[in-house]
C-alpha cells in the first residue's frame, strides 16, 4: 500500500511542483497568497506594536510579565533569518492559533518559511492548550506513549519540564521555518530588541551578558542549516555558548508562559458555558455531543475529560487514522538543491511521513528538540504512521464563515465535514487517485501508510449525513470567545 501511495504522489504532485517551479527566481505565490501574506505580516506588526506599548506600564505580577514577554517573542519577525516571519505567522488567534492564510490552507496545507521557497512537510498545529500536554512518557497500562508536542511528539518536555517550551525551540533553527543557522542567533537578535530590559527583569541581568563575535550579524543573516563542518557558526566561548543556551531556554519558557495565558488557553467556548450552566446546546449540537460520546466514538481519543480532568478533547496519545498523502505539499518538490544548495526533502517524491515512529527511529532532521530516549526506540515500529491526537478546542475558529481551514497532519482535509465524512466512510467507499472528481464524496485515496492504522474507531461508523452535520455543529461549540446570552 505504501508503494501505491508513492505512485499516486508522483503522478499528481503537479501543483506542488508548480509552486516551487520558480524557487530560484523569486516568490512563487499566487496574488491571493501574496495579499494574505502581506495582511498577516501587517497584523503581526500591529499586535507587536500594541504589545510594545505595554512596556511603559508593566504589571507588578511576574507571571503577567512573563506572559507579555512571551507574546513579544512570539510576534517578533526579527527572530527569523530574513526578519520576515514571526512564530505567529503560522499561529494567529483568529484561526484558533493555527494557520491564518486561507490560500495555503486551501492549496498546499503547509506554510512557507522565512526563506519563502522552503515549505514544511506538515500543517501548523494550534499552540492554544499546548502547554497542558504532559511530558512525554510511556503508559504501561495503555501500552502507549502519552504527551509531548509537535505532530510526532518530538518536543518531549523531558529537558525543560514543559513540551510547549521545547516545541518553541524548534522553529527558529528549522531551515524550512524561521531558518536561523544557530540558536544563539535568536538570542543575539533578542538582545537588540525593545523588550531586552523586560527580559533581564524577568530572567536576570546576565541573560545577554555575552561577548558576541564581530561577524555575528553576517553569520545570522545566512539561512540555515549551518555547514556540516561548522555546526555552531556563531563562534562563542564555551561559557558564552552555555549562557546563550540558557537564555534560549528562557525565551522558550516565556513563549510557553504566554501560550498558557487566558489570552490563548481560554476555556471560553459555548461548550464550557453549557458545562457551567450558563448556556444550552441547540438540538443539533446536543445530538452531535451524544454522537461524539457514543456512536461516532470520537470521545475515545478526543476525550472531554473524566473526574478531575480538564476537558481537553485529546487523550495526548497518537493514532494513524489513514489520512491520504497530500500531493499538494510543496515538500515533495524539495528534493533538489534550492538556490542556496539546501535539500529539505532527500526522499523527494517517495517521501512518506512516518510520524511518531519516524521520530523514534531516526529523530527529526529539520529541527532541534529531537533527542530520542533509547528505551523508546523499540517502540518505533508500533508507532509508524501515527500522529499526535490534536485537541478539538478551537478546531473551527476562523475569521469569517468562508475561511478555509486545513485538517490532519498534512492538511489533506479542507473542512470539518470532510474529515468527519472520512472517519465515517474510509473503509466503505472505494479507492481512487488523488484529485479524482469523486474524491471525498464517492471515494478516498489510499492511506499514506497503512502501518498501525486505526481500524476499531475509524472507517465505518454508519453515520448519516445529518449525523455528520450534527457532529460538526457540536465541534463548533468548542470555539473560544463565546458570550452567553444575558438572562432575562
Language-model features: locations:
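Periplasmic c-type cytochrome electron-transfer domains
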Residues: 2-5, 15-488
